[in-house]
Regions:
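Cysteine-centric segments in proteins
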Residues: 2-76, 83-131
Length: 131
């Protein structure tokens, strides 16, 4: 009985602390690769959120991925700013609004010699170099 209570407490505590440090959990997300003549190779999380009935859809591009860790059904991306994005495996992709915004970013970046590319869904994010 005591061990069951201790195990419950430890699991609950760890999940609470873990959740405390995650800043963003997008409804949809992709990783983009950015590089150019004067732009060092950088990977960033592009997150999309549904607005719901009275809200509006939104998006956010993180500061650049510094570190990645793998969860059971998700990935954690730590940005250069210190923020942490949690991307669930089943949510890789974008909603229509986010897709339009990112395509606009890709097109405008090309005009100034910067290549922005959406990474494939099944990329092993642990295999990439981030620094």
């Amino acid at each position: 009985m005591f061990l069951d209570a201790l195990e419950f407490f430890c699991c609950y505590y760890i999940k609470s602390v873990y959740s405390f440090f995650v800043n963003y959990v997008p409804d949809k997300w992709v990783v983009v690769k950015i590089e150019g003549k004067n732009v060092p190779l950088t990977y960033k999380v592009f997150g999309c959120w549904y607005g719901g009935y009275l809200g509006s859809n939104s998006w956010k591009l993180n500061s650049g991925i510094r570190k990645v860790s793998k969860g059971e059904d998700s990935w954690l991306f730590e940005g250069f700013s210190g923020s942490i994005y949690k991307g669930f495996n089943s949510n890789y992709g974008m909603h229509m609004y986010g897709s339009g915004v990112l395509n606009d970013i890709i097109n405008k970046s090309e005009e100034v010699g910067v290549k922005v590319e959406i990474m494939p869904e099944h990329t092993n994010w642990l295999d990439l170099s981030y620094e």
